[in-house]
Design a protein with these regions (language model features):
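Extracellular/luminal low-complexity segments enriched in Ser/Thr/Pro
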Residues: 389-403, 495
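Active-site-proximal segment of zinc-dependent metalloprotease catalytic domains
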Residues: 139-227
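Propeptide-to-catalytic entry region of secreted or membrane-anchored zinc metalloproteases
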Residues: 21-153, 315-320
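Pan-zinc metallopeptidase signature
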Residues: 284-326
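Low-complexity "stalk/linker" and mucin-like segments enriched in Ser/Thr/Pro/Ala/Gly
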Residues: 367, 371-389, 482-484
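The catalytic-center signature of Zn2+-dependent metalloproteases
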Residues: 200-289
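Bacterial Sec-dependent N-terminal signal peptides
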Residues: 1-27, 527-537
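C-terminal outer-membrane/trafficking sorting elements
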Residues: 441-537
């Protein structure tokens, strides 16, 4: 079966109308959205290949639902192990590293590199290199303030953002997007790989999970091996935009390919075979190798200052422990703590895991076994230990106009290891009165708080369930009231399909007060979709 895909670039933004919205069940290989073409001269500064490169990585996981799949620490650890096997050409099985064609199998070359989860975070905290967050979307487009809010220093960490909706357009089957080396992006904490958790590791099949390898290849300055409709990334089969010869992917030993997904029996514009199993190709059948030329190109990219800062000894001393088995306490649950109601009542348990030791059994003593800094007035914290886990309990009531960060430090006395690594774990008191899980909201149409809820239908209808007599108003971003109505019998349905795509505010006022929901109406081929975005107002 031939599967159609589309490419999103700065010059041609087709995501909103692309094939992915026609067939939400088919995963899309790579919606590459690189902000710069690969640098041709970087290959001239290639270092020798006799070095083992270690790249510190942090995975930021946003939300819990990825097209019915889930992303756990164990899944990420396994996915990264497999990606390292791909780069080092040690993948085995039916889709082994290399190519069945001897012409290309002899070109299969390992890169001596390890993408390793960070062990020390930016605040000096011990970490698994995996941070779980509230649901977010759209990091595949240019949104500096939001990305910078979560990003760890790009000069020390390779940031991988795991989310379901990469472009914030309601499409949940785009697999991944990455950017070439760029110092300005690194300096401003915008260098990144954005990837869909639905296609991470064992959440998908063995071949398609290698799209992550493909995206990491882009991160190290590799372009696609194929020509995509003679647009921004030609590979040698066609002339450039002005009739000039084009350099293709800047790699001599990857033959030109007229199109993506060419197979073993397809010939290119020169009448020759293509390296169809290359990781930088699109294939739903097999991708399993980098060539020697591509490895040389990645070695050159590793000398660029936007990438060399990642593997320096100075960086490693700040992001890795001297001994990976050293006892430490890491955050296991989400970084954000959400209130249970609109009044700002908090009753939240934060899970911390002890690695290399055990927790002290029973209640822990504040000020001795653990300390808390910056907790808002009105909230209190207590902690208990049990086996490998420490549970931090935060209770109380507070009204916030914005998220508030605080820190907890688990002292060695809370564990069985006197030399347990001590670091300040950053946590956030979220001002959202419900946990914002957009993926769940989009699929099930539910956001609940204080007995009220807002739900949506694919035709643009919004249903508000609230106490009888509650006032419901819909405003545009300019504050103009479009609809004002009252709930007659616990439910009210409003039709917004005729207003067109854009941002609207739905306010529900009852005896419990007023809560505003920010919603985004997105025009799609199969009707108007509404995404509910309850945020701090």
């Amino acid at each position: 079966m031939r599967i159609k895909i589309y490419l999103l670039t700065l010059a041609l933004s087709t995501a909103a109308n692309g094939f992915a919205q026609e067939r939400l069940d088919i995963p899309q290989p790579c919606q590459m959205h690189e902000q710069a073409t690969p640098t041709p001269t970087i290959a001239l500064t290639r270092a020798t290949a006799d070095k083992h490169y270690v790249i510190p990585v942090v995975f930021h996981v946003f939300g819990t639902d990825f097209n019915g799949k889930h992303v756990t620490r164990e899944l990420i650890e396994d996915a990264l192990r497999r990606t390292n096997d791909d780069f080092n050409a040690r993948t085995t099985g039916d889709l082994r590293s290399g190519d069945d064609d001897p012409q290309f199998d002899k070109l299969s070359t390992p890169l001596d590199i390890e993408f390793r989860l960070a062990e020390i975070g930016p605040n000096g905290e011990a970490t698994t290199g995996i941070v779980f967050h509230r649901l977010e979307s759209g990091f595949g487009v240019y949104n500096p303030p939001k990305m910078q809010k979560y990003a760890w220093d790009n000069k020390k960490y390779m940031n991988v953002y795991i989310m379901n909706d990469l472009y914030g357009d309601g499409v949940t089957n785009n697999s991944g997007v990455s950017w070439y080396p760029n110092w300005e992006m690194t300096r401003f904490k915008l260098a990144r790989v954005v990837y869909n958790g639905a296609y991470l590791g064992s959440n998908t099949d063995e071949n398609f999970r290698r799209v992550l390898t493909h995206e990491f290849g882009h991160f190290l300055n590799l372009a696609h091996t194929f020509d995509f409709d003679n647009t921004k990334f030609p590979d040698g089969c066609h002339k450039g935009f002005h009739g000039e010869a084009n350099p293709g992917d800047y790699v001599d030993d990857t033959p030109p390919a007229d199109r993506q997904q060419m197979g073993p029996n397809d010939v290119n514009c020169l009448g020759g075979k293509t390296n169809w199993t290359n990781y930088m190709n699109y294939s739903y059948v097999r991708t399993s190798m980098f060539t020697k030329g591509q490895v040389n190109r990645m070695l050159a990219a590793l000398q660029d200052k936007s990438r060399s800062c990642l593997w320096s000894d100075a960086t490693h001393a700040k992001v890795f422990l001297p001994d990976a088995s050293h006892p430490r306490v890491v955050l296991e649950s989400k970084q954000e703590l959400f209130p249970k109601d609109v009044k700002g009542n908090y009753d939240v348990t934060v899970a911390l895991r002890v690695i290399g030791a055990s927790a002290k059994q029973g209640p822990l003593t504040a000020g001795t076994d653990f300390t808390v800094e910056g907790l808002p007035d009105g909230l209190t914290a207590s902690a208990t230990g049990d086996g490998q886990m420490i549970q931090l309990h935060v209770k109380g009531m507070v009204t916030l106009g914005a998220d508030k960060k605080f820190f907890v430090t688990i002292q060695p006395s809370a564990t069985t290891a006197p030399d347990c690594y001590v670091g300040r774990q950053p946590l956030t008191i979220a001002c959202d009165y419900v946990e914002s899980e957009l993926a769940t909201a989009i699929k099930r149409g539910v956001e609940t708080a204080d007995g009220s809820r807002v739900a949506w239908a694919g035709n643009g209808d919004v249903t508000v369930t609230a106490p009888r007599g509650a006032r419901v108003a819909v405003h545009n971003v300019y504050g103009e009231a479009l609809v004002v109505a009252h709930v007659a019998d616990r439910a009210l349905t409003l039709s917004l399909g005729g207003y067109g795509h854009g941002v609207y505010i739905v306010s529900v006022t009852s005896s419990c007060g007023t809560k505003s929901y920010k919603i985004v109406l997105v025009s799609a081929k199969n009707g108007n979709h509404i995404k509910i975005l309850p945020r701090c107002q």
